[in-house]
Amino acid sequence: MFVLNFELAGVNKNDIKIEIKDSLLCIQGEKYKSMNNNNKNNLQINNDDKPMIEEEDDDSSSSSNNNNNNNNNNNNNNNNNNNNNNNNNSNNNNNKSSKTNDKKFISERSFGHFEKYLDLSPVFYQLDLSTINAQFEDGLLTITVRKTNLSNNIKIQIN
């Protein structure tokens, strides 16, 4: 039995097409990128195949920072000696907190159309193509093909 494994992480099973043309195994597909991890319906193809910098909002940290800023503003308003300095400090704190709320990361995943080819000609005569089977689980495509039962020995009679 021949077992072929291909890593296709991040690809949906329905977006994979497998064919054998002559003695060439062709695997084609489309890898999509979700614009927002919470919204899986918003998909986009990026044909650049380059790392990207993406922004991600974190609601829990921004709300806790806003609560801290409100507490700082209340403390500043209670202190009557340095109102001008405290207002400047609270404005600076608001600017700093809005900058720290933005999270950016680099994504090194490629997206878009892909094609993989495998030349089966060295073993093609050994393959029983009626038994070919493909499974896709956890980003791993496994193709299995049984060997033929035909022997390679052929006796030829002389006429």
From Swiss-Prot:
It holds the Pfam family HSP20. Residues 36-46, 61-95 have a biased composition (Low complexity). Residues 1-159 form the sHSP domain. The keyword Acetylation does not apply. Keywords: Stress response. The keyword Nucleotide-binding does not apply. Residues 35-101 are annotated as: Disordered. InterPro entries: A-crystallin/Hsp20_dom (IPR002068), HSP20-like_chaperone (IPR008978), HspG1-11-like (IPR051779). PANTHER family: HEAT SHOCK PROTEIN DDB_G0288861-RELATED (PTHR46827:SF1). Belongs to the small heat shock protein (HSP20) family. This is Small heat shock protein hspM. It comes from Dictyostelium discoideum. The gene is hspM.
